[in-house]
Amino acid sequence: MKKKISQAIIKFFKNENLIIDESKLIIEKSKNFGDYSSNVALMFAKQNKIDSLKLAQTIKNQLLSENLNLEKIEIAPPGFINFFISKNEYANIVSEIIQKGENFGRYSLQKKINLEFVSANPTGFLHLGHLRGAVIGDILANILEFSGNFVFREYYINDFGSQIDRLVSSVFSRYQQIFKKFALPEEAYLGEDIIWCAQKFFQIYANKFENSSLDDLETYKIFREKSIEIFLDEIKADLANLSIKFDVFSSESELFRTEKVQKNLANLPFVYKKEEAIWLKTSKFGDQKDRVLVKKNGEFTYFSSDIAYHFEKINSNFKPDFLINIWGADHIGYVDRMKAALKTVNLNQKLDILLYQLVKLFKNGQEFKMSKRMGKTFTIKDLLELVDQDAIRYFISERSYNSLVEFDIGLAAKISLQNPLFLIQYAHARASKLLANSTIVPEKILKFEAENETILISKLKQFEEIVLKITKNYKINLLNKYLLELANLFNSFYSNSKIIGNQNQNSLLSLTKAVQIVLKNGLKLLGIKAKERI
């Protein structure tokens, strides 16, 4: 309905050759002044040299002549327009939801999107920081696909460079400590996961490398490849335990092995040589300064492989219309340089980067602080022992990606209406139980009169708007907020309405069915089970 009203107003302005900025047209949900209201007449009266009340009246007359299923339109000084939806429209909304079922809220946007997320270094178990990126990425992919887009989910394995050297020396040292005293390197990773990995080595190779050294190339190669493999297998297992899937795991080292880094940089414009190093003039395209691609010793920088990786994604067989990268907020310094690199070859429209903030974990009222360097990390494995997958996905996604998440383990595990996820699932279970013991007669005409019914139906219709909004701003938390509001409205309706035995029973059961459908659709997008009973 909101879309219909907007389109009708825009059509009116264009037909009358009046000035309107469509981006500033606002149709707001209203409780006290009709179902929807707009200040469009106030906004554009001056530009069109028309009195705002007169413009509002003209808009009213035009819209009433169109088939918008509006009961009435009222004008309030100095030019507000209030729209009242016809009672028939509420019945139409409920019928539409039931008829479309699991397809209610879908669109057909038809864009190809490469979505890269998680991309954690294979140097240990996934922790809470990685978890947030994983959940955001997976839910966003679900919503983008639900909207009719084609989404290619990609994990970039950073298996090249100094962090891998640190991993190898750390695991090798812990392996040596199984047999004898052996000093840890100064920059060693200190986590329990490194000790675990070394024990895995011992299970596979026994004492084969007891007297070996990393100076031996074959020993180094085995420790490098096996350490990455062991941790990558664990990363994949953790993601699977959260029902998070990928279409491909791409390797940074593979880019170098196949010389794709060199090939992609060979014809890059705005490259110059200075101080025996090779630079890219990113400052010309919005970066703070130019960036080194190849050091004076001939070594490629991380930036060079990142550029090559993005070019590979863009030129892949998938041929994406645009890319989305989901990175931790600590990568903020990389955003401008990466976008600048793509601008050098006119690909700046191809990349959106979401920077998500940290997760703070609270346990028994105390914050559990993480430090991988000191070996104190709270991993996904740890969290899954305390709360289930559904709770993790809900509480990690309930805040905007650019806001801090405070994850309360106690609340997430609580079977109580204080727990927002429990409340939503409780509403779905309530609806399911009622419908399981009742019969809806599809042929009967639906009728909705009570305010709590029409408010609930209006909220149901908003599901479409929420889905579309998320495809534009990527704020998946809007879905959590919406589902909680819908569940609260339904629980109130359920508690304050006599449904079975009501002379309008069939309509109220149909409304309950519509609520069940929308809750289930929304929870499915979050990757959460819609429980039939609690």
UniProtKB/Swiss-Prot annotation:
Return the Gene3D superfamilies for the record: Arginyl tRNA synthetase N-terminal domain, HUPs, Isoleucyl-tRNA Synthetase, Domain 1
Report the subcellular localization: Cytoplasm
Reaction equation(s) it catalyzes: tRNA(Arg) + L-arginine + ATP = L-arginyl-tRNA(Arg) + AMP + diphosphate
Q: What processes does the entry annotate via GO biological process terms? A: arginyl-tRNA aminoacylation
SUPFAM superfamilies for this protein: Anticodon-binding domain of a subclass of class I aminoacyl-tRNA synthetases, Arginyl-tRNA synthetase (ArgRS), N-terminal 'additional' domain, Nucleotidylyl transferase
Annotated InterPro entries: aa-tRNA-synth_I_CS (IPR001412), Arg-tRNA-ligase (IPR001278), Arg-tRNA-synth_N (IPR005148), Arg-tRNA-synth_N_sf (IPR036695), ArgRS_core (IPR035684), DALR_anticod-bd (IPR008909), Rossmann-like_a/b/a_fold (IPR014729), tRNAsynth_Ia_anticodon-bd (IPR009080)
Which GO terms label this protein's molecular function in UniProt?
A: arginine-tRNA ligase activity; ATP binding
Keyword entries, A-Z:
Aminoacyl-tRNA synthetase, ATP-binding, Cytoplasm, Ligase, Nucleotide-binding, Protein biosynthesis
Q: Could you list the residue ranges forming a coiled coil in this record?
A: none
Q: Which GO terms describe its cellular component?
A: cytoplasm
Q: Where is this motif: 'HIGH' region?
A: 120-130
Q: Which NCBIfam families match?
A: argS
Q: How does the annotation summarize its subunit structure? A: Monomer.
Q: What is the name attached to this protein's record?
A: Arginine--tRNA ligase
State the species of origin: Mesomycoplasma hyopneumoniae (strain 7448) (Mycoplasma hyopneumoniae)
Taxonomy of origin reads: Bacteria, Bacillati, Mycoplasmatota, Mycoplasmoidales, Metamycoplasmataceae
